[in-house]
């Protein structure tokens, strides 16, 4: 039972209890701030920092007495020397049990020593401090360190993915400055999420890749802005609004043909141009073959390649005669 409550600190506390009987009982009944100060002091010895940076020698003479009778700040000063402002308060947010690894206490101490105001404020505002939160905070770009982000990211890997996602949004939205993104994170409501925040910023993208269809074509209208894409998605009642990231990244492009259908293009490798990929009508219903043929003829005229269906041995004639429809 004692090992479960005291974790890795158990052996050190048993030794200290031999020097100053009553330490174990004192730790087990101490308030969270004082108990965590003791764990932080023991972590400093475990990690050889602070006054313990000389090695694994015996505890200093007065250390056991400080642990037994001292206040939280007295214990921290005895272990680290100078105590950065706010350390005792952050330690109290850990709760009753020690963090799983001694080095996590050193990370917390160094955060304040390095004057990481954003990181410290993020921890103060995000409730109980865990090793997971420290991992997320360490991985999260310093610009996005806020309690609202810290509470919504579960792992360091997820924080890394978020960093890259923000970088992508900033690359296509000139208004998504560091200040704008940080401000949006700070203003998040309790029911909001980071994916929704990024989606809102993406919908304002204004730096899209060049479109394969030029403006001014009499039959093709390039959907070259996010507003065009969202408006077309509403009219055609399909999933186009969920493909806007693909458009912004240059992984696909969409144009409207004679206000009858949406034409999907995909990029060829090595920047060799674009390929006609598909044709869609309202609600992704089956597309009439005659309409597909018109789109293909237009793309042939523009020099846009497509999948070659020639040499079919009467297959197209059969489909045309029987009225079979192409499914989008």
Task: For each feature predicted by the language model, list its residue ranges.
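Sequence-structural signature of the catalytic-core scaffold of metal-dependent phosphohydrolases
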Residues: 1-205
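Catalytic-core elements of nucleic-acid end-processing and repair enzymes
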Residues: 116-328
